[in-house]
Amino acid sequence: MSHRYIPLTEKDKQEMLQTIGAKSIGELFGDVPSDILLNRDLNIAEGEAETTLLRRLNRIASKNITKETHTSFLGAGVYDHYAPSVVDAMISRSEFYTAYTPYQPEISQGELQAIFEFQTLICELTDMDVANSSMYDGMTSFAEACILAFSQTKKNKIVVSKGLHYQALQVLHTYAKTRKEFEVVEIDLDGTVTDLKKLEAAVDDETAAVAVQYPNFYGSIEDLEKIQSFIEDKKALFIVYANPLALGLLTPPGSFGADIVVGDTQPFGIPAQFGGPHCGYFATTKKLMRKVPGRLVGQTQDDEGNRGFVLTLQAREQHIRRDKATSNICSNQALNALASSIAMSALGKQGIYDIAVQNIEHANYAKQQFIKKGFEVLDGTSFNEFVVKFDKPIQQVNEELVKYNIIGGFDLGVVSDDFKNHMLIAVTELRTKDEIDTFVEKAGELND
């Protein structure tokens, strides 16, 4: 090239055309019909100096509404939580900052151990036997859990609560479209929790699995013990989609007999960054270990007796046994899993518990303030989210709240007409009393 930063000068183009035997760019694209070719230059501005360009891009970026510029009460799967500063410092180290899969244990012990620690932490939170190295996000983990259930039980029906995140259900239906024999039965809600009578009636001997969220999408805590009692006699698997931060306080799904626990570790060290990337986790019992999707890191000893880590049980993966593999997922979110591991380790067991308690306390305070303001707050024992009914469209309310530097809650009318004019509000440990009071006050004014 004539210049290291300016490729494709006229000289470069002529050399390339000569090499392939074309006289001009027009001749190169001669097979393309002329009526679909653009016969003018693209409407792109001339190049700018770096300082000018950065100034312009920063000006454009400043138009974004972020948690740095506004107070956020938006959750619905992505939350504004405290992330220890050590997280970014550690994951930025060059040893970790790579997308490379650690196939060669002799040069990857650091990354392999980090993944192993992530698996260990997830098992401790969920009270399960085995966890994989991570997945793309919680919704992918959930759909893969359902596929595992179909494969393990040889049954074709899965019963899912409508209390699951609506996008998780969408991903499941997308998976099911490619497997026409699979049947997905959705169970209605009773208020903001699963209708247990309808759930019990739907579970039969043809059911591969029953799946619920804990806490569910509407913020309420499902009765896992009772749900498990409907399942045990039917030889179906019990799948729980759980918020890992909530498990620092709530009884873990494994203690209720869950067979598969999945979710997203975004609450631990992963910022709410315009939709992603996230980090799914997948935990299960030892019985199902050989059907777990994705990577598994195991602990072993080298020939000198030293502790070491390797990718293990790879024969179950699609890059080894494509035709017999349970899953076609052959990757993970190692960097985000590392971020979550560092966050969990920095906080410690007590720190995670304390933050979980603060989420419940702050959310309950906000609930009471909305009730005092005359709002209808839907019943349900919650963690850090709850549902409030408004008299006006939520989109309209949220557009007005932005003027006060407040990001309002999620518009549940997007999910179901049954929740028209209902807002799903998230209140995490980062929300202060003053912020909550201001939010409730402005919401009340806008609702009049």
Curated annotation (Swiss-Prot):
Pfam families: GDC-P
Entry-linked SUPFAM superfamilies: PLP-dependent transferases
Recorded catalytic activity of this chain's protein: N(6)-[(R)-lipoyl]-L-lysyl-[glycine-cleavage complex H protein] + glycine + H(+) = N(6)-[(R)-S(8)-aminomethyldihydrolipoyl]-L-lysyl-[glycine-cleavage complex H protein] + CO2
Disulfide pairings: none
The entry's keywords: Oxidoreductase
EC number of this enzyme: 1.4.4.2
Subunit details: The glycine cleavage system is composed of four proteins: P, T, L and H. In this organism, the P 'protein' is a heterodimer of two subunits.
Protein name per the record: Probable glycine dehydrogenase (decarboxylating) subunit 1
Organism of origin: Staphylococcus aureus (strain JH9)
The gene coding this protein: gcvPA
